[in-house]
Amino acid sequence: MAVNDPNERGIQRILLAEDDDSMRRFLVKALEKAGYEVVSFGNGADAFERLKEEPFTLLLTDIVMPEMDGIELARKASELDPELKIMFITGFAAVALNSEESAARDAKILSKPFHLRDLVAEIERMLAA
């Protein structure tokens, strides 16, 4: 069962999963300033529990996290809501997603460090698609 599409209400909602506290706070502040509603968690397991409760437009997730990594989170999230757009942010530029990773088929990867305007521009491109 797909979760309701938040775009129907015109709300651009981002679910952020990032285990680095300072990076998470920075991203929330910056994305809210850019006009997005952001709900953030420090691990994939908590983020997935929230995703089961309400719809989001985009999942923005680190790859390496405790409890549930970003790839597993993306896989489970896309099973729950196939329309959910997914972007990975990672400090491990060499991380490659296997082609069999169903959640990663249309996902974008942004390597840390990145400039905030690049992140916002990439999010805008994904949400416009």
Where are the language model's segments positioned?
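Alpha4 helix (beta4-alpha4-beta5 surface) of REC/receiver domains from two-component response regulators
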Residues: 72, 92-111, 117-124
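Acidic catalytic/metal-coordinating carboxylates
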Residues: 19, 43-46, 69-73
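Active-site residues of response regulator receiver
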Residues: 62
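Charged docking surfaces used in two-component/phosphorelay signaling
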Residues: 22-33
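Short hydrophobic/Thr-rich beta-strand motif most characteristic of the beta2 strand and flanking loop
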Residues: 35-42, 50
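Non-catalytic signal-transmission and effector/linker regions of two-component phosphorelay proteins
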Residues: 1-15, 117-129
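Receiver (REC) domain active-site loop signature in two-component systems and cognate sites
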Residues: 65
